[in-house]
Amino acid sequence: RKITGIVMDTRKQSLPGVTVLLKGTALGVVTDKEGRFNIEIPETDPIVLVFSFVGMKKQEVTYTGQEDIQVVMEEEVTEMDEVVITGYQVIDRKKLTSAITSVKAEDIMIPGVNSIDQMLEGRIPDLMLTTNSGEVGVVPRLRIRGTSTLVGNREPLWVVNGVVVNDPVPLDSDVLNDPDYVNRIGNAIAGLNPQDIQRIDVLKDAAATTLYGTRAANGVIVITTKKGHVGKPVVRYNMTTTYKRRPRYSDRKIDLMNSKERIDLSRELAAASYLYPSDMSIVGYEYLLQQLYAGVIDDEQFAIEVKKLENNNTDWFDILTEDAFSHNHTLSISGGTDQLRYYSSVGYTKDNDVIKGQGISRYTGNLSLESDLTKWLKASMDFNANISERNYEQSAVGSVNYAYTTSRAIAAYEEGGDLSYYQKRYNSFYRYDFNILNERANSYTKQENSGFDLTSRLVFRFTDWLNGDVLFNYAVSNADNEDYWGESTYHVACIRKSNYGVAAPSDSELPYGGELSEQNTRNKTYSLRAQLNLNKYFGEEEKHNINGALGYEMSSS
């Protein structure tokens, strides 16, 4: 069922970027620049749509069969908090002159979404999110108020608990524009469990560069994680599951020919003396016709083989994809006394893709301690660790694209159960044996990431208007990437210049064996910051205020 509509404010102005969700699910869309939306939902009753946008009251609308829904959203008159966090300071919102947007993490949680950057879509004005790949676990590209290449890329700066965090792999200019590589490795917060986040502040104007320099040319996203509270221990368990349906030939949007229709088309093209492209792989009906004209088979054999092709109806989607179930678990405990407060959590994510064999496993751990050592001295410690493994097929294999573009008349298996190969053209001179199942079984891309981050802080309260802050952070990240092609694959045959099992020519670059590429990155960073903060109110009814900070910071990576 398709539902369309428009979202406006009380002044009848359209609202782009509004998140529209089917209540109780992760199924949703975002309104376009005209404020319009178009969402397809399964048959269910009742149908309740949830509309949300930063600065507006969340609204629920029950669908009763309207042809076009009109939703008017009202402004949220209450502020999230009386303060905002910039990473260096906590500022009274009433005194704020910068463009800063603040949201609570609990307000943007979407079931089944395991990345906080994806949850920000439609919730932060001037923030644009794009994904260049449909693969599981890929990192979207974030853009805040346009783009800049002043610092070599266009990504915003991430700050967690006052510390700038870097990507797990420092990228050079050769790979910055490679979406297959950049999207898969994850960004600076890929190892952070969204369930551990308390709030998010987004800095978008010159105030960001004042604090962080040229690194903030593309904006700053400040994340504050959860802390302990005074009281008895509170244990929480959160679990989300998602279901991803694989493509099927019966889907309305997949209008592809069956084997009989494809062979009939080939007959029409042959009767019209159609000239095929020189780089086309000759397979199926065209291959049999070529064999017939060459005298390799007779008319009777030709008719028998064509009949087999008409009855193949290979279900490539069933062979290469599967319905996928994913799940996410977080167990946390928090509590404490006036002197010591704590928050700790462990998390596990298993995110499976519809492409068989693709998926992500991730483990996270978090510990936060806060202690009032004296009336004038407070100490805190935040520790975060993560381990993840990502398994993908080689991007050159392209299972989903292959299923969409390959004739169903082509068989995946021989009658005896062995793989069925055809000659795939490499260039005008060479053709080698190809079967996509052989490519998948003998190639892979595997990425393993791990790391930990430790932040310690001392806060000195000299007076009620003057305090000092000393912060130390140490972080380690490891990234291992492995790409493999076996010697029996078409990919290696093109390098070897011969089919598997056939002697390679003397000028072959790879006469035997396969291809293995490994990239290992180890990154260690530390930073030390000392800061003095002044926030003094004076005068009648404390109408006047002096606010400032003086600090020194050093870092290394």
Task: Tell where the protein language model's regions lie, with residue ranges.
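Surface-exposed loop/interface segments of Gram-negative outer-membrane beta-barrel transport/assembly proteins
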Residues: R154-E155, V160, L171, H229-N312, ...
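Short, small/polar-rich motifs associated with maturation and membrane association
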Residues: R1-N366, L373, K378-S380
